[in-house]
């Protein structure tokens, strides 16, 4: 029976060593991030929501890089107002570079005034540029360095989603951000593809 207890002890030690470091400063981002390769259309497939009113589903983002290397983005998606009024709304973001090519300051605002605006950190946690991307932002940190108010998007180039292999990578990144099981699936049902012009703001 001693070997059984030894295995139990090893498992306990392994669990303790594997305890996740949830301080924001410990999170890894994409090495040698390339803005030009990242540009183009991305479909939001899952989202960890922050505080405030943001786009809720049917979210499509378009990233671009100008001749000076500055990145910007536009996004369209559905928002529900007053619990029963669905509208399509646009948001705009501009990015300021930092010393790390995968970490930006993002100034964003809604074309409609009811949407949130701010100037948040915007980190590209991981991407292969052709299939998936995981974005993260911490808007407010606790005293211990963990995040008190964060949001995160999982983006795809294909609105139909990922292969099982990519899903496994994405789940791992979500766990590394201490956000496992905190994302909700983003639907894409064509609500904002031009069929509902009367409800576009």
Swiss-Prot record:
Keyword Endoplasmic reticulum: no
Binding annotation for substrate: 116
GO cellular component, one term: extracellular space
One GO biological process term: retinol transport
Disulfide links within the chain: 22-178, 88-192, 138-147
UniProt cross-references to PROSITE patterns, sorted A to Z: LIPOCALIN
Omega-N-methylarginine PTM sites in chain numbering: 139
InterPro entries: Calycin, Lipocalin_ApoD, Lipocalin_CS, Lipocln_cytosolic_FA-bd_dom, Retinol-bd/Purpurin
SUPFAM superfamilies xref list: Lipocalins
Subcellular location(s) per record: Secreted
UniProt-recorded Gene Ontology molecular function terms: retinal binding; retinol binding; retinol transmembrane transporter activity
Stated role: Retinol-binding protein that mediates retinol transport in blood plasma. Delivers retinol from the liver stores to the peripheral tissues. Transfers the bound all-trans retinol to STRA6, that then facilitates retinol transport across the cell membrane.
Database matches in PANTHER family: RETINOL-BINDING PROTEIN 4
Subunit annotation: Interacts with TTR. Interaction with TTR prevents its loss by filtration through the kidney glomeruli. Interacts with STRA6.
Family: Belongs to the calycin superfamily. Lipocalin family.
Protein name as it appears in the record: Retinol-binding protein 4
Species of the source: Sus scrofa (Pig)
């Amino acid at each position: 029976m001693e070997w059984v207890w030894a295995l139990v002890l090893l498992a306990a030690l392994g669990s303790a060593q594997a305890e996740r470091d949830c301080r924001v400063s410990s999170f890894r981002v994409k090495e040698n991030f390339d803005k030009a390769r990242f540009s183009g259309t991305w479909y939001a497939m899952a989202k960890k929501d922050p505080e405030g009113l943001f786009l809720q589903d049917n979210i499509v983002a378009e990233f671009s890089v100008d001749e000076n290397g500055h990145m910007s983005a536009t996004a369209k998606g559905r928002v529900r107002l007053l619990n029963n009024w669905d509208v399509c709304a646009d948001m705009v973001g501009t990015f300021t570079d930092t010393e790390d090519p995968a970490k930006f300051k993002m100034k964003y605002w809604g074309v409609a005034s009811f949407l949130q605006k701010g100037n948040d950190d915007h980190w590209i946690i991981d991407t292969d540029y052709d299939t998936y991307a995981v974005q993260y932002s911490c808007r407010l940190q606790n005293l211990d360095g963990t995040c008190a108010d964060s949001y995160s998007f999982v983006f795809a180039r294909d609105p139909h989603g990922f292969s099982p292999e990519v899903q496994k990578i994405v789940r791992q990144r979500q766990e590394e951000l201490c956000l496992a099981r905190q994302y909700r699936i983003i639907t894409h049902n064509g609500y904002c593809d031009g069929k509902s012009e009367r409800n576009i703001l």
